[in-house]
Every structure is written in C-alpha cells, then in structure tokens.
Amino acid sequence: MDNSTTAAEVSAPTDYDYNSTSYDDDNPYAAPCSLTETWNFLGRFAPVAYILVFILALVGNILVLCVIRRYRQSRHSPCSFSLTDTFLLHLAVSDLLLAATLPFFAVEWISEWVFGKVMCKITGALFSLNVYCGVLFLACISFDRYLAIVHAINISWRRKTCHAQLACAFIWVICLGLSMVDMHFRDLVEIPGMNRMVCQIVYSEQYSKQWQIGMQLVSMVLGFILPLLVMLYCYLHIFKALCHATRRQKRRSLRLIISLVIVFVISWAPYNALRMTDSLQMLGVIVKSCALNNVLDVGILVTESLGLAHCALNPLLYGLVGVKFRRELAQMCKAALGPQGCLGLVGWANGRGSSTRRPTGSFSSVETENTSYFSVMA
C-alpha cells in the first residue's frame, strides 16, 4: 500500500487517498488497485457516522457540563469537589471539542474542504488534541477510583482537587504538543482528476513512511495501550476489593466496572489493530495486496467511527450512572420545566427503589466524605 492510501494517519480523522487507483511503491510495474468502490462506500458512510456521533456527543456532554455547573454554583472554591468530578469535567470538555470537529470532516466527505488552509490545520490539531486527552482523562478517573476504594487515600489529600487541576493542565499541555504534528503537516491537497480539495497530513516525501509508522506507534501507545493498562490494573484491584460485597449497589458497581473496560476495548481495539496491520504492511512484514488495501481503507474508517462514538458514550458511562448525578439532573429539569414536567426523570433519578432511600457514596472505608459527586461508584 502506498503511503497515503491507508486511512490510518495517526492523529486526525481518517486521511484517505482519494485517487481512483493505488500503486505499490515497491513494485511500480504492478497493476493498479481500483479504489472507486471503496471511495463510494466511504463517501456515504463517513458523513452519516460523523454527524450521528456529533449530535449524541453534543447532547450528552452539554448535559454533563450543565449539571456540573449547577453543582459548582453552590460552592465558592474552584477546589470544592472531588478529584473524579474534576477529571469528569475535563473529559466532557475534551469530548465536546472533539465532537465539534466532526461536522467539518463530514462536509469534506460530502463535497470538499471549503474552510481554508488555516482551519484545516486548526481542526486537525483540535481533533488530535482531544482524542489523546479523552483517553488519558479516562485513565485518570480509574486511577482516582483505585486510590479511593482500594487504598482509601487520606480524605484531606483527595479533597484538594487543585491537585487534579494541575494533573489535567499537564495532560492538556502534553497532548497539545502531540497535536502540533497536525498543525505543522496538515495541508490542502487537490484530488487528481476530480477538482476537489481535501485536508490531509502531508509528510515530506523522503521520510513519509518513517513519520507515518512513528506517529502511529506513538498514537497506539498513548491513545490506547497505556490507558488500557492503567484501567485494567485499577479496575481489577477495585473488582477484587468489591467482589465479596453483599450490598446490591456494590454488586451493581462490579457490573459497571466490567462494562467500562469492555466498552473501551470494543471502541478502540479494532481501530488500533488495523492500524498496527497497516504499519506492518508498510514495513514489509505483511505482503501488500489490493484486497488488503481495501480492507484496511474501509476497516480503519469504520472502526475509527466506532472509537469516536466513545465520546458520546462517556456521559452515560461516567455521569448518568451516578445516583447523585441523576438527582442533580432531575433538579435542573424541575427548575426548567416544573415538577409536573419531570415526573419520570425524578423517578429514574431516585433509582428503582424507594425515592426516600438515602444516597450512598463511594464504596470505600471513607464512604461519606470521599464520595465523588458524579462518581461511577455513587
């Protein structure tokens, strides 16, 4: 596969080779691979997938931010709520910014890139920045839950959420540096024979393959492998700490832990597996073929869309499952629509049991004060 054929650029929505044919760089005399059918399918699939993820992520994450804002208004200090809530706030912002880039790339697939070179660079960098930030914030949430439940870290330390703000700032800075690859290399490219402009990463011809493979490796390590290892380690120990619990809500938390890991793996593992296959093909470990080219082109974009859907699922997995989060959402609804307009939501917020049931917090030895207001364990 040539350097631009595969939809596997590291830190941007799928960069696809819009040529109608693809040639093997190692054998220039080989018959070209036809990409017409692949292009037609992706041109129909990508806009629908991007817009659907955009709408769902927009609604879910705005709800999360509104509920957090309502809660913060009742506090006076920027360090007034738990570490997990701080990470959840930054996760929602990151997912919202990521979703905001998708309509631009949907328009590109429908027609062409019409927003100019500057927006091409900014949009690509913003996408890259928030993909990295999102998965790293997920790792931070799991680590904070691990400290609270398994080790019951000192309450006074964990309530100083300014520590979490510093950690979040560090993550933003690191990911901003990684996104500069897009800012530097993204450019407008004209599709031969189609008179259309697209926004793609364009590496220097001499080092194109090295850059692609190197950045794919960085992306897989920071964007999937490292967060997955952190989540597996933390949630495995949380699972062990709660596996002997008898309370119904603790058993419910065990099911939630399993769901969090499974959803993350299903969302991102297929995409990273296909990108690894593409890297091996570029290195010559896997023999190139037209059939494999088409599988990678279609598969990477489809699985990328599956991964992007995770930013729409995060509000459900990390926010709405918390009893107290749902109650705050119900109160916000009552304030906006009145008590009669939110009867169903109030019942849902109180759970299946009695509406007068006392809310429980995190399942640690410091249950009351160590609770995350929007914790997945609440």
Swiss-Prot record:
PROSITE patterns per the UniProt record, alphabetical: G_PROTEIN_RECEP_F1_1, G_PROTEIN_RECEP_F1_2
The entry's keywords: Cell membrane, Chemotaxis, Disulfide bond, G-protein coupled receptor, Glycoprotein, Immunity, Innate immunity, Membrane, Receptor, Transducer, Transmembrane, Transmembrane helix
Spans within the Cytoplasmic topological domain: 69-86, 143-164, 234-253, 326-378
Null allele phenotype: Viable with no significant effect on survival. Macrophage and neutrophil counts are normal. Macrophage migration in response to cxcr3.2-independent stimuli is not affected, although the basal migration rate is reduced. Macrophage migration to sites of bacterial infection by S.typhimurium or M.marinum is reduced. Dissemination of bacterial infection to distant sites and granuloma formation is also reduced.
Domain of life where this protein originates: Eukaryota
Disulfide-bonded cysteines: C120-C199
Residues linked to a glycan: N3, N19
UniProt record, GO biological process: calcium-mediated signaling; cell chemotaxis; chemokine-mediated signaling pathway; immune response; innate immune response; leukocyte migration involved in immune response; macrophage activation involved in immune response; macrophage chemotaxis
Any Gene Ontology CC annotation: external side of plasma membrane
Extracellular side: 1-47, 108-121, 186-212, 275-304
Keyword Phosphoprotein part of the UniProt annotation: no
UniProt keyword tRNA-binding, yes or no: no
Predominant localisation class: membrane
Protein name according to UniProt: C-X-C chemokine receptor type 3-2
